[in-house]
């Protein structure tokens, strides 16, 4: 437990901007404590919840037609692209059957995935389903997964282990390009497992999808609450991926126990405005 003098020492070492950030975290919790007494005792979860869900931290809600256009993909200029095949597998099973069959599976067959399988999974779960007039654009892309304000705060990175015709490495799913953009080359299985203790079974996954939150994409509109919304958005995408993988005959599961800083380093994310939120290893059936 920190002593009072230790806390004061930590605060003294902060810049004025850093001290204001700490104060912003404390104010909502202290107001709740004044109102509710001991029932609002301070703890880490309570501090984060009240700070991030404080209405005062939300930016003024912008009108859909009058706001800036969100950056829908991170810049990866000059990177090589892996185009998707023209013909992709379709989802043909009734939804109720897919819901009944969905399960978290880690027992992958060990054979590689086809590029058409990965392409079909990404496109059916999180591809562009059309366009709409929004954010000063007459053809703003709409995706298959919902998101707060439609700003699409989730980026999907694909760490390729064994996919036919695709070199091992980390890629960004780029629906506008209908393909993958190269981020880093090389076999990254060891790096992923090191960042996710107890997941040696991921070695046999054909690919590992990493869902990352792009906070600035929603922060201009929702303020600090965009951090919470980014988790919701990733959950929507993750569920779509689970259901589409099941329908396509693939095995998939979600992994949330990881070292976020180490994982961000693998993907070249800054770990501040672009943060990893969820891993989803994908593999084939026996």
Q: Where in the sequence are the language-model features?
A:
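Short pre-catalytic strand/loop immediately N-terminal to key active-site residues, enriched for Gly-Thr
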Residues: 225-233
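Long, well-ordered alpha-helical scaffolding segments within enzyme catalytic domains
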Residues: 234-244
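Glycine-rich phosphate/pyrophosphate-binding loops
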Residues: 242-262
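Short acidic/His/Gly/Ser-rich catalytic and metal-binding motifs that mark active-site loops
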Residues: 217-221
């Amino acid at each position: 437990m920190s002593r009072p003098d230790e806390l004061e020492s930590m605060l003294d070492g902060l810049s004025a901007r850093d001290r204001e950030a700490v104060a912003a975290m404390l104010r909502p919790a202290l107001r709740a404590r004044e109102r509710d007494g001991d029932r609002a005792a301070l703890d880490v979860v309570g501090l984060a919840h009240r700070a991030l869900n404080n209405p005062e931290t939300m930016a003024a809600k912008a009108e859909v037609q009058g706001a800036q256009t969100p950056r829908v993909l991170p810049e990866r200029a000059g990177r090589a692209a892996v185009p998707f095949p023209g013909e992709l597998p379709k989802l043909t099973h009734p939804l109720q059957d897919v819901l009944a069959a969905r399960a978290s599976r880690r027992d992958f067959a060990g054979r590689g995935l086809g590029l058409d399988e990965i392409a079909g999974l990404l496109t059916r779960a999180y591809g562009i389903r059309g366009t709409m007039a929004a954010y000063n654009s007459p053809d703003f892309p709409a995706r298959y997964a919902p998101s707060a304000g439609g700003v699409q705060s989730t980026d999907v990175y694909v760490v390729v282990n064994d996919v036919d015709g695709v070199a091992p490495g980390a890629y960004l799913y780029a629906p506008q390009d209908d393909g993958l953009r190269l981020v880093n080359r090389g076999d990254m299985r060891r790096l992923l497992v090191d960042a996710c203790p107890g997941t040696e079974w991921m070695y046999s996954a054909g690919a590992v999808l990493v869902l990352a939150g792009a906070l600035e994409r929603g922060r201009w509109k929702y303020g600090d609450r965009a951090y919470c919304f980014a988790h919701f958005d990733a959950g929507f995408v993750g569920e779509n991926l689970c259901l589409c993988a099941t329908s396509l005959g693939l095995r998939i599961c979600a992994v949330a126990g990881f070292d976020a800083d180490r994982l961000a380093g693998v993907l070249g994310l800054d770990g501040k405005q672009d943060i990893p939120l969820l891993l989803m290893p994908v593999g084939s059936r026996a």
